Amino acid sequence: LLLTLPYKLVGYWAMPILNSAMVAGAWILLFRVYDIRPSRLVLCILIVLSLQPIYTSAVLVDAWFFPAIILLLSARRLPEVYVGILAGLLLSGHGSGQIFALVFAVLAAVLFRSRRQVVAGMVAAVIAFGMNVLLDAMIMPETPRLSKTFPAARVFSVQPELLRREADRSGNLVLSEAADEVARIKTYPENKGRRDLFWDVWKTSEGEFDLAKFEEHHALPILKDAFMFEPVPLARTIFLDFLSYYGPATQFDFQPVLSEPFPERFYASHQAKGFFAAVPVESVATILRYGCYLAFAAALFFGWRRTGADIRRTIIGIGLIAIANDALFALLSGPPDRYHHRILPLLAIGTVLLISGRVKQPVEAPA
């Protein structure tokens, strides 16, 4: 909805222009709320290390996560209801938005004891959920939300036996054929680490694999079975997926071959030519990502003692949001790393706050 008018004016460039304006505005808001003036050079370096320019220019959902969190942080100085509404609109870009709004509300209550931030988080959760329901009803009324299908697909991509067991239990021939297809796909070495084999099955089924029926009748039994049928290997895979986000390999989600049709110009783009899947590009991204980790760790080591209690609580909150983000997507999807990458700018926030020393503490505005 936010892109409708800009898209009519400037076409494709509407997304990077709008995202850039939001991200820049979020940084400015952070400086005003915490009354800091960081070095422009240091700030630019941190922004590059956090891979923020890539996602701001190319991915709507992950670019909006950053300004949404800063808006919620600013609720101590700004009207909490309006802040919550704006943050909720941004977080509604992904189904996990309401979860993280609630996570923020809990952290605000525990760490900051800030009623205003709690209210902002709760309002954001309601708005994000409401917008998702509204958009689904307007745009895809016949398609289920697949809230159970995605985690079910994640577990049977790791353990194809789960899909086979559900096919045997239900007597569903399509599921039986899908189980055979998953087992076949996993025999290829390049698919060993994939957690999204569901889409391969769906594409090759030529419409026989009914998403609505799978969501309603089969996804939940598969999830329940996952906790009973060899849960230890599954738990180990989830834990290793969590650790892989911090490992030396970087996997972007800019796939060269997409399932949905795109304008003709896409097929002449760097993405379609496999630029983002090239080893040199992924290696540079890994170096930058580790630079972001090291900058945050160094700022934490040298700046922790000379910052005020409020900033320390903010840093702890940022760390917990980052862990919650990675834990959620290790559980639900696993690699690629784009969902981990969206917490890198939060580490850049923490670094800026720590190196800014004893910044002026934001005073909560009267209710």
Descriptions of predicted regions:
Residues 9-18, 237-318, 322:
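Membrane-interface anchor segments at the N-terminal boundary of transmembrane helices
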Residues 30-50, 63-67, 80-82:
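Transmembrane-helix signature of polytopic, membrane-embedded enzymes
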Residues 1-25:
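Loop-to-helix entry region of an early transmembrane alpha helix in multi-pass inner-membrane enzymes
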Residues 15-21, 44-71, 89-103, 339-344:
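Multi-pass, polyprenyl lipid-linked donor-dependent membrane glycosyltransferases
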Residues 142-265:
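Membrane-proximal stem/loop segments at transmembrane-domain junctions that anchor or position
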Residues 100-129, 349:
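Perimembrane helix-loop-helix junctions
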Residues 72-82, 110:
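Membrane-interface transmembrane helices that cradle and orient dolichyl/undecaprenyl
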Residues 80-94, 124-130:
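Membrane-interface alpha helices of multi-pass inner-membrane proteins
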